Curated annotation (Swiss-Prot):
This is Non-structural polyprotein pORF1. One of its GO terms (biological process) is DNA-templated transcription. The protease domain interacts with host EIF2AK4 (via C-terminus); this interaction inhibits dimerization of EIF2AK4 and prevents EIF2AK4-mediated phosphorylation of host EIF2A. It comes from Hepatitis E virus genotype 1 (isolate Human/China/HeBei/1987). Changing residue 1120 to I: About 70% loss of viral replication. Residues 775-921 form the Macro domain. Residues 1454-1565 form the RdRp catalytic domain. Optimum pH is 8.0 for GTP (methyltransferase). Optimum pH is 4-7.8 for FTC-casein (putative protease). ATP binds at residues 975-982.
Amino acid sequence: MEAHQFIKAPGITTAIEQAALAAANSALANAVVVRPFLSHQQIEILINLMQPRQLVFRPEVFWNHPIQRVIHNELELYCRARSGRCLEIGAHPRSINDNPNVVHRCFLRPAGRDVQRWYTAPTRGPAANCRRSALRGLPAADRTYCFDGFSGCNFPAETGVALYSLHDMSPSDVAEAMFRHGMTRLYAALHLPPEVLLPPGTYRTASYLLIHDGRRVVVTYEGDTSAGYNHDVSNLRSWIRTTKVTGDHPLVIERVRAIGCHFVLLLTAAPEPSPTPYVPYPRSTEVYVRSIFGPGGTPSLFPTSCSTKSTFHAVPAHIWDRLMLFGATLDDQAFCCSRLMTYLRGISYKVTVGTLVANEGWNASEVALTAVITAAYLTICHQRYLRTQAISKGMRRLEREHAQKFITRLYSWLFEKSGRDYIPGRQLEFYAQCRRWLSAGFHLDPRVLVFDESAPCHCRTAIRKAVSKFCCFMKWLGQECTCFLQPAEGAVGDQGHDNEAYEGSDVDPAESAISDISGSYVVPGTALQPLYQALDLPAEIVARAGRLTATVKVSQVDGRIDCETLLGNKTFRTSFVDGAVLETNGPERHNLSFDASQSTMAAGPFSLTYAASAAGLEVRYVAAGLDHRAVFAPGVSPRSAPGEVTAFCSALYRFNREAQRLSLTGNFWFHPEGLLGPFAPFSPGHVWESANPFCGESTLYTRTWSEVDAVSSPAQPDLGFISEPSIPSRAATLTPAAPLPPPAPDPSPTPSAPARGEPAPGATARAPAITHQAARHRRLLFTYPDGSKVFAGSLFESTCTWLVNASNVDHRPGGGLCHAFYQRYPASFDAASFVMRDGAAAYTLTPRPIIHAVAPDYRLEHNPKMLEAAYRETCSRLGTAAYPLLGTGIYQVPIGPSFDAWERNHRPGDELYLPELAARWFEANRPTCPTLTITEDVARTANLAIELDSATDVGRACAGCRVTPGVVQYQFTAGVPGSGKSRSITQADVDVVVVPTRELRNAWRRRGFAAFTPHTAARVTQGRRVVIDEAPSLPPHLLLLHMQRAATVHLLGDPNQIPAIDFEHAGLVPAIRPDLAPTSWWHVTHRCPADVCELIRGAYPMIQTTSRVLRSLFWGEPAVGQKLVFTQAAKAANPGSVTVHEAQGATYTETTIIATADARGLIQSSRAHAIVALTRHTEKCVIIDAPGLLREVGISDAIVNNFFLAGGEIGHQRPSVIPRGNPDANVDTLAAFPPSCQISAFHQLAEELGHRPAPVAAVLPPCPELEQGLLYLPQELTTCDSVVTFELTDIVHCRMAAPSQRKAVLSTLVGHYGRRTKLYNASHSDVRDSLARFIPAIGHVQVTTCELYELVEAMVEKGQDGSAVLELDLCNRDVSRITFFQKDCNKFTTGETIAHGKVGQGISAWSKTFCALFGPWFRAIEKAILALLPQGVFYGDAFDDTVFSAAVAAARASMVFENDFSEFDSTQNNFSLGLECAIMVECGMPQWLIRLYHLIRSAWILQAPKESLRGFWKKHSGEPGTLLWNTVWNMAVITHCYDFRDLQVAAFKGDDSIVLCSEYRQSPGAAVLIAGCGLKLKVDFRPIGLYAGVVVAPGLGALPDVVRFAGRLTEKNWGPGPERAKQLRLAVSDFLRKLTNVAQMCVDVVSRVYGVSPGLVHNLIGMLQAVADGKAHFTESVKPVLDLTNSILCRVE
């Protein structure tokens, strides 16, 4: 037996699963988001109605009509996306402000429910005017809306949208109204339930309840809380039945979208409507069963015989179908009514097995059940009778046929053969049955209803109406009637413009003559200031325009206005005609609506009217929120300053380009004459007249949004192909306002002789210009260097000269794409019109250039050669061609081979269009090489630089070279200096090497390569394999030229080294410098010694070296080796030297860097010069830096000398950076916390903590008494009385202090460092032994260059250089200065925020020299301590948060021991300092360095900006080892003073510490240490504790402290600029990221530790979500400063 079907195929299974997953992901990505809260039944209804669309439920709002509104929103999106700029009928008031594409809205005066809708309409924006006119009965304020209704308005528009607003109009009325508007298309959303076709009654379906009384129908959907739809029955019936309107205003009605019984109808004006039958309800889930007995009626003398009064019942289609199948197949003896009733009762119960619904069921009333049983029984009885009769009559017929003789059979056989339409079988006889008989059935199935009725428009003549009624009467009788009246062809709108929102002019020829406004007018910018504000222009442009005045010469001729604007030394021309295209800075298009008879202009949201008056030209500007009049006096204005005009034009250009980059849709492209002209802001037909070739339109006003995607093919070498002449523009444009000069002919070469196998030039198909303009939906996937492009989309959107059809061998209409070609261009398949054949391909020019290409049929045979030939045969043409993937449809050619064949056989500029499946394949297999796009602006600027360069002696080789717009593929190998990039190139890989200098050229030639400098290489790079060494330093115009001319290009270089220098200072080099992305990075250098690597590691973080030289940099020694200088003057002064720029790429054994004073600006502006100079040697480099230029950029001997002086060694250590990762959203409980109101959150926080709004901004506490030291005061203690803050709330939850106040600085100095120090002279051995529990004996510590690098890296990250690091000279005050400044950070507190009496916080920063001296040692000691820490002990923040949280979670049975040090810094004394020095001795630090540290700490001077304090012993918060020694002292105190049982976790950071244990007690020696040092310890022992911004909950983990973080936000000043707010918002986002998986746990735990309600924490998280989303509200407050300072008592020690 065969068993292959039982063999499991893992590959196929995996592919199927991946395809299913991809389909599911695609469905979810394009799902409909359902925002309202819904019941379970409503969700099931929506899922059934919206099939097959995927739904995503995100409940966040309550709607009165949730089901209808979801459907409405979906259909609205479809209508608005298709209609573009349009006229809207009956818009909902709340949608006005959200849809700026609507040019006009037609309303009716409000009545009934409409009044309530207008009261809830927005009171701002365009809706405000509409609301005011609707509620007050006022006329419309502008042309954007009216209250005349759709049928009473005549605003011209080509496209319309009606969303559920045409139920009270018939199709004929709509056709007439569309004709009045000149409308050709109307998208109408209508609710058309099938029950309106039935008699009056009450119909309940699974979705809605419908009540039908004969005239009106009321529909209420499941879950509606207010009245539903209420419409006229006759209109709904006509909308369901009608597919076309005939008469003087013909229409075609097409159903383009349907969701349930909600339809989108596309009404299109068509001269000859054709029959378009349609099935409106193919997915109906109900069948309507008729009851024999109708409802009770009114009393009457005689019983009624009207059959239309009977009642119908909605029955699920599956119930009726199953019931009929069961009854029709029952045995004759088993068929009875009771059996039908039993079966119906069984299938009416809903049965669910697990998650599978086995039987959907039906919840029906008794009346409906009775009607269904009756109808089903009678229908089945009738069918059974027919079955019996048919079998009986058929048997008798068979008996007669079998008894026929030979002659009769022969006679029948001959006549059957002669018949053309042969259908087997025979009808025996006609069964008498009519539609209204009982035998016709009792049910109506909407799934099989077909309608194709026409409605005549009401404007037909009486004769036409009479004949129409006669025809309809004859049809009602069942007779065919040929109407002799043809539909009258009426106007269907302006056909001259293919613009969806074109507003034609309704001009009455009988109106008065047009007023003439010709003349010269003075237009000052000050008169148009309100308009500038409405245009939302920047303040700079408004200010510059206000200082300018223009002279405008207006000429009006034949409904057209020409303006000549004189602005300074510039002249602009504009031409105003109706329908002119206005330039925009985005994809959206605007056309000018100009009515000369009405003296009006309009486009987009702006309109104006003008009139000649005695004072001059009076213009009224109208827009949203703007109604401004301006009068321009006749005459000539004084000439504005050329400098002001140029600055205005440049600023305006920058604004246009910035708006172009940021806008998705775009707005007007503002020209100077458009803002300083009488008809602002319009400037159609803009021309800037300028005789200077370096200014004007070509350089300043260059837009990237063009009318067409013109493909320009780059110049190709003459290879025997047919030359391509210049092709006229293929974009259909409106008639220009002014005659345009003829285009210059393209200097293309003469056609050469055709290649073998190609047709002669005379036989080549020559393409005429093609006009094409349509909406683009294609998507660019890739662009090749030759200009060819790959698109995803429809082939017919292309603007190429030729279209390629996937044809068959006979070139007859077929299926697939060939059928689409036949539908659009049927004449192209006429073989008589073929102008040329090439192999199997046929060329035709009728009705447009088309190539019928024939691919092989892979169903029969795989033939790659024929596939190549199919593409090759389409290249015998002039112009570009748009291709499909030949053969991938019906012929089943794989996508890959067909695509490869096109790549090898196409011409430059061709286009390939892929369907979605092939597009996905291409995106998964697209070329991986990076590409450089050369835009028109870059090409133009590069060519200008080449022209300037070719005029010099060096650049003569570049004469005639051009850079063309396009895309270039390249390979870029980047690497650190000396990484061997050049050595990796072999002669077999390259034809030409381009290098920037002669030295490099000679070096390459010595290796056997053909190397050239950039200018001379222009003769040899065409079509060659090119390697460009030191590519970033090449002049960018030459780099672009060689990259574009080369067949393949491989770039070598270092992006961090010297870029190309603009020696001419023309500004062209930085304008076209390309942004090159390295394809590979090499990080290992074979040249640079170790110390050089450490100095440049800031630019190369991953640099490594193979050099064994450890120290190579020396200062102050005699010059050796090659001299390197920075300027040409220094080169002249030092014979034999080369500049750093010339030495780039070279390698020397020894070098001497000579920095002269004239190189200061160069080195400060380009640190790359210093990097190049430092990386040229392999053994030794002597630096002669008399002016100290290299020191200013962080390269000095002070850092290195101090490092080695302190005992540093060259070597490698473990880096101090701790790897951290972002937690995955594996639970993502944060998603359950939506953004909430910040006001309510902060008010609730204030209530829970007992804080109230503070009447002051800060508090200056009383200054403590100075107990030790000497304080120097300024003569004046000036203070500001108030503070301006930009805050989230006026309730602050932090201790309030004033860091910028001078008195606050004094209070902090004295309070922290002026307190008397309690000295304690004792041995450190006991404390060190106790500390060994956490930090064992450290031993000798090695300080390496790794710590030196980390020090330099930290300085660079802070924006510092090495200039502040000095030689270690203690006589120099700058070496030992300690700077004090007030800290702008206040502590969060749950207690008193004002009357706390505590001084502020400050930082005492040591000098950069001391930081560089001690910093590497302290980093090395810290690394040693981290390596010795026991398990469960955490130091500082040198650990991953997840590891700490896991350790806390593991300590389930522990309590939290917390210690709060008070006055931690000020209580440190000689004993703590001695312990630090003892540990330094233990680590092997030099004794002189330890004694220096002890000296600095024991007696010091803190230097504030205007104050200073001389003091003793205190700990400094800004010294290099602050965190290290504070943490060590904290550990020593805790472990010496307390004993812990079952210690699980201990964490120390500065003065903050926690220990997780089961019990603790104070150790015997604790009292001596606490009393001797004057320590102030506050211990707390509780189940949950706080530590370093997190909540420590044993068994649960370390959770973010939401309350503390939110409280600290209240103290932050979010101003004055947006940068500060952005920083804080990023901090909030980072904090929320920590809450991703533990948000709900935080609510429970944080609320317990602070004793607040969980709702508060929940509300605070929502508030933080709102802040992170940028939805925070800020309040600017000006509050006074409370001064509580008293006199400062000084006492000299």
